[in-house]
């Protein structure tokens, strides 16, 4: 069975509240062999926090429709989980027919 690929999309390149929640979600699902989760945001301070937690990271240059489309083409997620207003808006414009969860 092929893994379901979920891409968590965030605007911030820092590690704070929302970013911590996403890391906890990814870590809680780590033992599920049917799901692969990846964190996607601009590169920055967040990289160190993700490396410490062994979380896959897809860095983007900037949160734009063009850049998110590029990373979607590369990663081929089955689902996008957007965690803030800008990520939700950009993700919705870039996702095509890929389902998106936005909050």
Residue positions per predicted region:
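Nucleotide donor/acceptor-binding cores
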Residues: 2-4
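Active-site proximal beta-strand in glycosyltransferases
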Residues: 6-7, 95-103
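N-terminal strand-loop element at the rim of the active site
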Residues: 8-63
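Short, well-ordered alpha-helical microsegments
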Residues: 46-47, 88-91
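Short hydrophobic/charged patches on amphipathic alpha-helices used for structural packing
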Residues: 65-69
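Proline-aspartate-enriched helix->loop->beta-strand connector
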Residues: 76-78
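Short His-centered aromatic/hydrophobic patch
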Residues: 82-88
């Amino acid at each position: 069975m092929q893994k379901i690929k979920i891409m968590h999309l965030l605007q911030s390149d820092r590690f704070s509240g929302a970013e911590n929640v996403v890391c906890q979600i990814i870590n809680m699902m780590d033992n599920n062999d049917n799901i692969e989760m990846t964190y996607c945001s601009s590169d920055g301070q967040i990289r160190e926090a993700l490396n410490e937690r062994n979380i896959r990271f897809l860095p983007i240059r900037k949160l734009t429709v063009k850049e998110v489309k590029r990373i979607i083409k590369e990663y081929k997620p089955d689902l996008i989980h957007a965690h803030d207003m800008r990520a939700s808006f950009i993700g919705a414009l870039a996702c095509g027919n890929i389902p998106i969860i936005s909050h």
